């Protein structure tokens, strides 16, 4: 165990050191990698994308090479124990330096593939980012010592530069008192539907609305804000969000803006069964017109494997709760969602989307 902790600490120190060096550099310090060069384009394709995992794969591979010069990330990616060194070391270094990342980025992208090659890249999205990972790591592995060091330094410089672009992004401010409650509610809901951020934004909005609705009551709202910040754990949850009174669960909610299949219901049943909540009411908050086409729903409900599932429309649910909130609670919801979007782990695409909807309301 001590060896594992020591290795993870070494990985964390390595990434911290490389990013520390990157902060002292400028683009002019890398004349061989000017815009239009192969390496510049490869790093643009793998770093400046919404998917965080490709950056995580490369950081993990470079850290593995630092810890073991015989490590071959292209043919034995899992040979460096990527989960351990990323979650136990690299992740902390990235967080400390404000670099966007998830808790298990490299594993989410590698998907148990030991070989990172063109065949692997074809199954990833975006494929251009995956291909860039393969080609860049190939350049690193084949390079002589000095060239390898330059390639690695430039990667961390570009990674740091990208993180600064995100942290410096100016998000439009909105004032809840200046516009109709339903007007702003509609815009906020439409924003979360157009830029769902892998489903995190709709889930977060629902959690905030429920929290605002029940803030002065004995009901506690649990869940809804973990995954985007990399704080999710492997422990099983009964649902995305649930309500409790004095620690006793009363209602469960699944929030999705993707089509719901029977497999999705099976997954829900498994979660309910494994957590001992099979007899509690559960509601799917979804896009009724799009997400339940493959289900034989009647009057908003479906009995499946002796379990009743209820379904309500995401937009109607949100707008109804907006109408029930006080002015103060409405303002809190807007402020919290804006803070959520401002977080470094939210993509530039989604931040730009926020400004698309709310620019001019400040």
Annotate each language-model stretch with its function.
Residues 1-138:
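Terminal, charged accessory segments of proteins
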Residues 14-16, 88-92, 107-113, 159-168, ...:
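Short, mixed-charge, low-aromatic patches
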Residues 81, 180-181, 261-263:
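A diffuse structural propensity rather than consistent per-protein peaks
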């Amino acid at each position: 165990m001590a060896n594992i902790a020591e290795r993870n600490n070494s990985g964390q120190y390595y990434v911290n050191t490389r990013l520390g060096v990157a902060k002292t550099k400028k683009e002019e310090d890398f004349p061989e990698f000017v815009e239009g060069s192969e390496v510049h384009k490869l790093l643009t394709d793998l770093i400046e994308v919404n998917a965080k995992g490709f950056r995580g794969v490369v950081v993990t591979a470079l850290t593995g090479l630092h810890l073991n010069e015989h490590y071959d990330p292209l043919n034995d990616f899992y040979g460096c124990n990527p989960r351990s060194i990323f979650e136990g070391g690299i992740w902390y270094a990235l967080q400390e330096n404000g670099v966007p990342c998830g808790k298990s980025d490299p594993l989410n992208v590698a998907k148990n593939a030991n070989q990172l090659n063109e065949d692997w890249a074809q199954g990833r999205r975006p494929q251009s980012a995956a291909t860039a990972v393969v080609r860049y790591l190939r350049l690193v592995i084949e390079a002589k010592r000095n060239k390898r060091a330059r390639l690695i330094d430039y990667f961390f410089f570009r990674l740091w530069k990208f993180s600064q672009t995100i942290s410096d992004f100016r998000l439009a401010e909105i004032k809840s008192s200046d516009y109709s409650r339903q007007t702003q509610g509609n815009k906020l809901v439409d924003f979360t539907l157009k830029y769902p951020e892998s489903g995190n934004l709709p889930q977060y909005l629902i959690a905030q609305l429920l929290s605002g609705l029940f803030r002065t009551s004995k009901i506690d709202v649990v869940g809804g804000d973990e995954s985007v910040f990399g704080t999710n754990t492997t422990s099983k949850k009964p649902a995305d969000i649930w309500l409790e009174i004095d620690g006793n669960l009363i209602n469960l909610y699944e929030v999705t803006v993707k089509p719901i299949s029977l497999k999705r219901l099976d997954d829900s049943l498994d979660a309910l069964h494994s957590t001992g909540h099979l007899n509690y009411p559960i509601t799917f908050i979804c896009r009724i017109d799009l997400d339940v086409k493959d289900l034989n729903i009647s009057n908003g409900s479906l009995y499946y494997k002796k379990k009743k599932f209820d379904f309500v429309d995401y937009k109607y649910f949100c707008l109804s709760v907006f109408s029930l909130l006080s002015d103060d609670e409405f303002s809190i919801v807007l402020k919290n969602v804006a803070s959520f979007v401002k977080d470094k782990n939210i993509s530039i695409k989604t931040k730009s989307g926020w400004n698309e909807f709310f620019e001019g309301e400040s």
